[in-house]
C-alpha cells in the first residue's frame, strides 16, 4: 500500500540489559483500509495463500480487513492463526480480538499477553496453563481443535489443545550470549508455523519455534545467521 500523504512508519527499539522496549509511530501503516485488501492484485495473493497469520497490532488499524481474511480462511478450509502481540491488545481492543477468536486455529502469546487476555475475559487466575485451557475451549467456527501457545521467555512453553495441556522445555542459553530479544516472539511463531504447515506433531513445531527464537536473541536486531542450521528437531 502506498499513501502519498504519509511517510513510512517508524519503530525505535531500546535495549536495556537482556530486555527491550519499543516506541512506534505507525504513520502510513495506520492508514491501511479494507479497500486495499480487496484490490485484484492483493486479493489474488490471498486466494493463493495456504495459511494466514495476523498480528494483534493489526487490530488497532483495520479489524474489517482481518475479519475478511478470517472468513476467507474458514470458507476455504485454510488455517488462520493469530498473535496477541502486546498486553494492550486484549485490554483495549477486546472486541475485534474476540470477533476473530472463533476463526483462530492457532493462538500465540507470551505470559504477560496471556495474563492481560485472561483479565479482560474475567478469569480470576494468573496460571498460564489454566488460561490456555480456558481460551482453547472458547467457541470456534469449525470442528478443528484450537491450539493455544504461550511462551515465557526463559521458562517452558505451554501448549493447550484438545483438552490436553503440555509444557515444553526451551533451549538453554547462557545469559551472556543474549544480545537482543527483539523479534524473538515473531521468530518463535515463524519456526512453529514452518512445521505446523507440514503437519508435523506439536512437539516438533514448538522445538522449531524455540530453536529459531534462540538464534535470533544471539544477534543484533531481528536477524538470522547465514549458515544452514544444524539443529535436529
What are these regions (language model features)?
Residues 1-167, 171, 222, 226-233:
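Ribokinase/PfkB-type carbohydrate-kinase core domain
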Residues 140-146, 154, 172-233:
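Conserved post-catalytic alpha-helical subdomain immediately downstream of the catalytic base
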